[in-house]
A protein has these predicted regions:
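Class I SAM-dependent methyltransferase SAM/SAH-binding core
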Residues: 63-65, 69-116
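Conserved class I S-adenosyl-L-methionine
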Residues: 2-57, 71-75, 95, 155-190, 232
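A short acidic, Gly/Pro-enriched loop at the edge of an enzyme's catalytic core
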Residues: 115-126
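Core SAM-dependent methyltransferase catalytic element
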Residues: 221-224, 238-254
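Short alpha-helix
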Residues: 205-222
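A short SAM/SAH-binding and catalytic strip from SAM-dependent methyltransferases
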Residues: 126-139
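A short glycine-rich, Lys/Arg-flanked "PGG" loop and its adjoining helix->strand segment in the class I
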Residues: 140-152
């Protein structure tokens, strides 16, 4: 077996671990996102943050990459956009579809790899994604695909954080903060938290200086007007923003 085949096998193994983790978490994670949908204040903050970065307030074709249980896709569909959510975990998509039905939200959901999108070029006006890029084995490949399916002038809004920094502080009691403590995540056992830490530190982005690394990748791929807002978490999550892994917003235009 050559080095390239070995690398491919490692990536597939890592993807499988990610899928298994989120399959296990799907139902409990859905509870968290349903609570957010019910919370007009937090949903209003997300809508304000996204809306101020989009060219119009409704009627856009928007792709929610790594939709999970469908929060962004449902929220934006309820406010007049045509949304498609994709995810690589079927259990998450099942939760998303059930939640969308309960809200009568006109959002569609597809099983798809964020690194290999099954859409024609120039399909979407905007791409939104939340807490995804830290879970991707090949971020550059994903960014290239996102650039491809955006229409000219299309917008990428990537909300993420350098979660590896929080994991690395696990043994520093005064610094480390568990997701279940600040985000209200339920069903997280010590075993699941350990798996999450292992996955996080296995990803390429875990050893990079983020979001600077992302900015360099996006510029290299051909995005323009690339910028980062490191205070997004303070406005949206407020006291729930992780001190060691604050939420940032990466904006990029095709």
């Amino acid at each position: 077996m050559n080095s390239q085949e070995t690398e491919i096998d490692k990536e597939k193994e890592l993807e499988q671990k990610v899928q298994e983790y989120w399959t296990c978490r799907a139902h409990d994670f859905s509870t968290v996102r349903k609570n957010e949908l019910k919370d007009n204040e937090i949903s209003g903050r997300w809508l304000a943050e996204i809306g101020q970065n989009l060219p119009v307030s409704s009627g856009l074709d928007i792709l929610d990459v790594g939709t999970g249980t469908g929060y962004f896709a449902i929220l934006l569909a309820l406010h007049g956009h045509r949304t498609t959510g994709i995810d690589f975990t079927r259990a998450m998509l099942q939760e998303a579809e059930e939640t969308a039905d309960s809200y009568a939200a006109n959002a569609s959901f597809l099983y798809m790899d964020a690194q290999a999108l099954d859409f024609p070029d120039n399909s979407f006006d905007a791409i939104v994604t939340r807490n995804l890029t830290w879970t991707i084995p090949e971020p550059e490949k994903a960014y290239q695909e996102w650039h491809r399916v955006l229409r000219p002038g299309g917008i990428l809004l990537n909300f993420d954080a350098s979660y590896a920094d929080n994991v690395r502080n696990h043994n520093q009691k005064e610094s480390y903060v568990s997701f279940k403590d600040v985000y209200g995540h339920c069903g997280i056992t010590p075993e699941l938290e350990k798996k999450n830490a292992e996955i996080t530190l296995s990803m390429p982005g875990s050893c990079k200086s983020r979001p600077r690394w992302d900015i360099e990748l996006l510029s290299k791929i051909g995005f323009s007007n690339v910028s980062v807002d490191k205070t997004a978490g303070q406005r949206i999550l407020r006291e729930k923003d992780l001190p060691d892994a604050p939420l940032f917003l990466i904006y990029a235009k095709k």
